[in-house]
UniProtKB/Swiss-Prot annotation:
GN (gene name): fieF
Organism taxonomic ancestry: Bacteria, Pseudomonadati, Pseudomonadota, Gammaproteobacteria, Enterobacterales
SUPFAM superfamilies: Cation efflux protein cytoplasmic domain-like (SSF160240), Cation efflux protein transmembrane domain-like (SSF161111)
Catalyzed reaction equations: Zn(2+)(in) + H(+)(out) = Zn(2+)(out) + H(+)(in); Cd(2+)(in) + H(+)(out) = Cd(2+)(out) + H(+)(in); Fe(2+)(in) + H(+)(out) = Fe(2+)(out) + H(+)(in)
Keyword field contains Secreted: no
Membrane-traversing stretches: 12-32, 40-60, 82-102, 114-134, 164-184
Protein name (database record): Cation-efflux pump FieF
Taxonomic source organism: Yersinia enterocolitica serotype O:8 / biotype 1B (strain NCTC 13174 / 8081)
NCBIfam families to which the protein is assigned, alphabetical: CDF, PRK09509.1
Length: 300
């Protein structure tokens, strides 16, 4: 396990947990004083944020454990489970927002002290922007699915806080249904984000292949290597930070076993240089045993 990967994902998960805890306390105070349904929506979302970020923190720590006798491929899929759990948390909060929004749309109430709500929302907006910027940088460095899911979650929070600001301002000027309307819009966006996040997590758990551009890079590296006649049966997947790459190399029929082994090792090192930490399995085939329709065949 790359020490930098472990350090970055732990820092990102811990930062999200701390921020969610602070914002939850602030929003409870603000909602109590204003009665805003949009702030209630933000409060519920912060509660879900905290639960999701705590889950993320513990799961990320577990996923970083090295492979053992019972989990020979490591614990990386725990990240996908964390993302799936987050999608469920977020879906639940979206449904709550729909119910509350419809209730207040039918019976709108004037807000108490909307100025306080605006200040609290501004604090939440800028602090969440800082967190999302940090998380995006971590995802760019690590490709962590759990942190990417958390980042998508907090990106929806940024949108939500912006919408709440508009709703509070409109309510201040007498348009009291704006609060409920924006709560419904926020709920719809959060539900969409949750469904997208859940889909990505399920695809990872089902061992979806690596993206087309990465598989094309693998093909380019292998087929351009001196001594490699062709290749077939490329299989790829990703579990946590680890990419798994399997393929068959086609070589000269009479190539000595030691030379075939050395050639396969060279290809493996070239792939590891491009995809550090990857788990690579290469099978060597003499061209005579490969059916004609499979020569130099790759499934993309």
């Amino acid at each position: 396990m790359d020490p930098q990967y472990a350090r970055l994902v732990k820092a990102a998960a811990l930062s999200a947990t701390v921020l969610a805890s602070i914002l939850l306390i602030i929003k409870i105070f603000a909602w109590w004083h204003t009665g805003s349904v949009s702030l209630l929506a933000a409060l519920v979302d912060s509660l879900v944020d905290l639960a999701a970020s705590l889950t993320n923190l513990f799961v990320v720590r577990y996923s970083l454990q090295p492979a053992d006798e019972e989990h020979t491929f490591g614990h990386g899929k725990a990240e996908s489970l964390a993302a799936l759990a987050q999608s469920m948390f977020i879906s639940g909060s979206a449904l709550f927002l729909f119910l509350t929004g419809f209730q207040h749309l039918a019976s709108p109430e004037p807000l108490q002290d909307p100025g306080l709500g605006i200040w609290v929302t501004l604090i939440a907006l800028f602090s969440t922007l800082i967190l999302v910027t940090f998380q995006r940088w971590v995802v760019r460095k690590t490709q962590s699915q759990a942190i990417r899911a958390d980042m998508l979650h907090y990106q929806s929070d940024v949108m939500m806080n912006g919408a709440i600001l508009i709703a509070l301002a409109l309510s201040w000027y007498g348009f009291h249904r704006a609060d409920a309307l924006f709560a419904l819009g926020i709920g719809a966006y959060i539900l969409y984000s949750a469904l997208r996040m859940g889909y990505e997590a399920v695809q990872a758990l089902l061992d979806r292949a690596l993206p087309d551009d990465e598989r094309q890079e693998i093909i380019n590296i292998v087929t351009s290597w001196p001594g490699v006649i062709g290749a077939h049966d490329l299989r790829t997947r990703q579990s946590g930070p680890t990419r798994f790459i399997q393929l068959h190399l086609e070589m000269e029929d009479m190539l000595p076993l030691m030379e075939a082994h050395i050639l396969a090792d060279q290809v493996e090192r070239a792939l590891l240089h491009r995809f550090p930490g990857a788990d690579i399995l290469i099978h060597q085939d003499p061209t005579a045993v490969v059916p004609k329709e499979r020569h130099a065949h790759w499934e993309l």
